[in-house]
Amino acid sequence: MANSKSALKRIAVAERNRLHNKAYKSAVRTLMKKYFEAVQAYGNNPTPDNLSVVEQCMSAAYSKIDKAVKRHVLHRNNGARKKARLAKALKQVATAS
């Protein structure tokens, strides 16, 4: 256990940041899952409506990833890798149909 006042404060700050980061990462994962589901639906039925849903999901996911990188929740390479996975999924479906 911490002995000094400043160490106790650091423990409190670390816990606060951990919970904040956990919420951000959870939101990123949720938006990515929604995007992959939208891409799969677009692959099964490629209509302009489904494409617009995919684009909205992509925009939301990209935005949340970029904000997580900006706030140092994710490393920039990790954010870039996640965005590349999203783009790759759509590209594979687009070339298949």
From Swiss-Prot:
SUPFAM superfamilies: Ribosomal protein S20. Disulfide bonds: none annotated. It comes from the Bacteria. InterPro entries: Ribosomal_bS20, Ribosomal_bS20_sf. GO terms for cellular component: cytosol; small ribosomal subunit. The keyword Secreted does not apply. One of its GO terms (molecular function) is small ribosomal subunit rRNA binding. Keywords: Ribonucleoprotein, Ribosomal protein, RNA-binding, rRNA-binding. The keyword Ribonucleoprotein applies. GO terms for biological process: translation. Binds directly to 16S ribosomal RNA. PANTHER family: 30S RIBOSOMAL PROTEIN S20, SMALL RIBOSOMAL SUBUNIT PROTEIN BS20C. Belongs to the bacterial ribosomal protein bS20 family. This is Small ribosomal subunit protein bS20. It comes from Rippkaea orientalis (strain PCC 8801 / RF-1) (Cyanothece sp. (strain PCC 8801)). The gene is rpsT.
